[in-house]
From Swiss-Prot:
<feature type="binding site">
    <location>
        <position position="249"/>
    </location>
    <ligand>
        <name>Mg(2+)</name>
    </ligand>
</feature>
<feature type="binding site">
    <location>
        <position position="127"/>
    </location>
    <ligand>
        <name>substrate</name>
    </ligand>
</feature>
<feature type="binding site">
    <location>
        <position position="275"/>
    </location>
    <ligand>
        <name>substrate</name>
    </ligand>
</feature>
<dbReference type="Pfam" id="PF13378">
    <property type="entry name" value="MR_MLE_C"/>
</dbReference>
<keyword id="KW-0460">Magnesium</keyword>
<keyword id="KW-0479">Metal-binding</keyword>
<dbReference type="GO" id="GO:0000287">
    <property type="term" value="F:magnesium ion binding"/>
</dbReference>
<dbReference type="GO" id="GO:0047929">
    <property type="term" value="F:gluconate dehydratase activity"/>
</dbReference>
<protein>
    <recommendedName>
        <fullName>D-galactonate dehydratase family member SeV_A0456</fullName>
        <ecNumber>4.2.1.-</ecNumber>
        <ecNumber>4.2.1.39</ecNumber>
    </recommendedName>
</protein>
<dbReference type="InterPro" id="IPR029017">
    <property type="entry name" value="Enolase-like_N"/>
</dbReference>
<feature type="binding site">
    <location>
        <position position="275"/>
    </location>
    <ligand>
        <name>Mg(2+)</name>
    </ligand>
</feature>
<dbReference type="InterPro" id="IPR029065">
    <property type="entry name" value="Enolase_C-like"/>
</dbReference>
<feature type="binding site">
    <location>
        <position position="223"/>
    </location>
    <ligand>
        <name>Mg(2+)</name>
    </ligand>
</feature>
<feature type="binding site">
    <location>
        <position position="352"/>
    </location>
    <ligand>
        <name>substrate</name>
    </ligand>
</feature>
<dbReference type="Pfam" id="PF02746">
    <property type="entry name" value="MR_MLE_N"/>
</dbReference>
<comment type="similarity">
    <text>Belongs to the mandelate racemase/muconate lactonizing enzyme family. GalD subfamily.</text>
</comment>
<dbReference type="InterPro" id="IPR013341">
    <property type="entry name" value="Mandelate_racemase_N_dom"/>
</dbReference>
């Protein structure tokens, strides 16, 4: 039995990029040996901190940090009810930190513990958006000049983490020149208003313009963000076939995944799903029945590296590739965890990447190097990233609910964000 023990577990909250982040730090009885893990659930950041500090920390202190699988399994069932996003993120922070410790003990990067490199660099896709087709085209050209070969293209709707403005939908809708939403009632409930029908009609126009101007040498991704009806999603996937997307992301909501069978029967557009998944019963039938081409779970929301590696292997056996979620509301520690999985998985597909500002890179030394559309990790033991707690404390979290989640359709009905 190892004499190594967990002596302390702390949750570090910080927002150097303007988005609330949570990082777990696990300390041991070996001086200087600690691990970091991402537990970021931005929309419920203080609930995750409470789960870690009040439940996970007492559960962990005194345990052997090298027993990663046992800690993960016992941690999952310790609350009896399981597979919710708050406890999964808490468990993820612990799990990643334990892998970080294990790598440091072995003197190896985590990707070596997971089987070693399958590739020399990690191809990335970045976000592009705009108020009309020409603006989107211009932004894509700028990313192409930076070396990106894969881009996500959005117009006049949710722009994702590719913009510095946190009021994402409001900003995009205000700039949308070619989307005419339906009128709203006289008295509007506060929220971010979005017309899913007008949006769906605009998407084929966008990709028709982009292919005519940019050709087929650049890979395009589009995120529906689950905000249309299943029938509309099917029609959209069929219409977009001619534009040969790399994939269409989240065409339906998790509550409507049974519709993917009908979509698959009617369209050859590649499909990516998983951003909102929290447990195996959501992704397993999609992989078993070959209803998706890419699995893109948010690694911290499914519980960390341990379940993500198993999911990657299971996907490999069924011809499905990985495309882990990589938005702005993931800490650089989580970004590195994604990339260690990317390097060690033969069925890796693509990695979403959100640029990091100087403050993020200052608080988190050891961030990946980005060069001409590829990411490169350092070869340091563990996850290869650290946190400067004094600098992190300069960027306190606000804990508010992001405005983009307050979505409504033109008549005022609450909508999926």
């Amino acid at each position: 039995m190892s004499n190594l023990k967990i002596t302390n577990v702390k949750t570090i909250l910080t927002a150097p990029g303007g988005i609330d982040l949570a990082v777990v730090k696990i300390e041991t009885n070996e001086p200087g040996l600690y691990g970091l893990g991402c537990a970021t659930f931005t929309q419920r950041i203080f609930a995750v901190k409470s789960a870690i500090d009040e439940y996970m920390a007492p559960f962990l202190v005194g345990k052997d940090p090298t027993r990663i699988e046992d800690i993960w399994q016992s941690g999952v069932v310790s609350g009896y009810w399981r597979n919710g996003p708050i406890m999964n993120n808490a468990l993820s922070g612990v799990d990643m930190a334990l892998w970080d410790i294990k790598g440091k003990l072995a003197g190896m990067p985590v990707y070596d513990l997971l089987g070693g490199k399958c590739r020399d660099g990690i191809p990335l896709y970045c976000h592009t958006d705009g108020g009309d087709e020409v603006e989107v085209e211009d932004n894509i050209r700028a990313r192409m000049e930076e070396g990106y070969q894969y881009v996500r293209c959005q117009m006049g709707m949710y722009g994702g983490a590719g913009t510095d403005d946190l009021k994402l939908i409001a900003t995009q809708l205000a700039r949308a020149k070619n989307i005419q939403p339906k009128r709203s009632p006289r008295s509007k409930t506060p929220g971010i208003y979005f017309d899913p029908d007008a949006y769906a009609k605009s998407v084929p126009r966008l990709f028709d313009h982009l292919r005519n101007k940019l050709g087929f040498g650049i890979e395009f991704i589009h995120d529906v963000h689950e905000r249309v009806t299943p029938v509309t999603a099917i029609n959209l996937a069929k219409t977009l076939e001619q534009y040969q997307l790399f994939y269409l992301e989240d065409p339906v909501a998790p509550e409507n995944i049974d519709w993917l069978k009908m979509l698959r029967q009617q369209s050859s557009t590649p499909i990516s799903m998983g951003e909102l998944f929290v447990n195996v019963n959501e992704w397993k039938p999609l992989i078993d029945n070959r209803l998706i081409d890419y699995i893109r779970c948010h690694v911290s929301t499914i519980g960390g590296i341990t379940p993500a590696k198993k999911l990657a292997v299971y996907s490999e056996l069924n011809g499905v590739r990985t495309a882990w979620h990589g938005p702005g509301d993931i800490s650089p520690v989580g970004v590195c965890a994604n990339m260690h999985l990317d390097l060690s998985s033969p069925n890796f597909g693509i990695q979403e990447y959100t640029p990091m500002n100087d403050a993020l890179r200052d608080v988190f030394p050891g961030c990946p190097e980005i060069d001409h559309g590829y990411a490169y990790l350092n070869d340091k033991p563990g996850l290869g990233i650290d946190i400067d707690e004094a600098k992190a404390a300069k960027y306190p979290c606000e804990g508010g609910i992001p405005s983009w989640t307050m979505a409504r359709t033109p008549d005022g009905t609450a909508s999926r964000p």
